[in-house]
Amino acid sequence: GTLRELWAVKPDGQGDVTDTHVVWRSKTHIGRYASPLLVDGLLYVTADENYFTCFEPATGQVVWTDRVPGRAAASPVYADGRIYLCNQQGATTVFKPGRTFEVLATNTLACGFMASPAVSGKSFFLRTRTHLYRVESLPSGQGTTASRKDP
């Protein structure tokens, strides 16, 4: 298998900084595709093998790690006080950011995600393997609306 590591590197170095500017490294549930997400001083990382992990970015200490549904290739995104993680089986899991692993909701579409969601205002743009969806929050108490674009 491919060696996967997450590195924290001080940004002020020049040249080969391997011995002088690497703050920490971790091999704990690191994915091949998704980018890490920094929210309110915590670093969130998803792994291909159904894990979601929260790190202390200054030290690399694991705050928590837990299993999530499906396999993720898309990067997690943060919007409106929540973290959204889409998987290859079509589920989007919604998390509360923080030092405790807390799932708020799971929503499922017919096809899986490889692409990361895009956020614009109150709208989410979700590209599955077969469709492009736009999901938008309506004014308070009115729920959400969704539209789908066929290829």
Regions inferred by a protein language model and the residue ranges of each:
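Noncatalytic, solvent-exposed loop/strand surfaces
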Residues: G1-P151
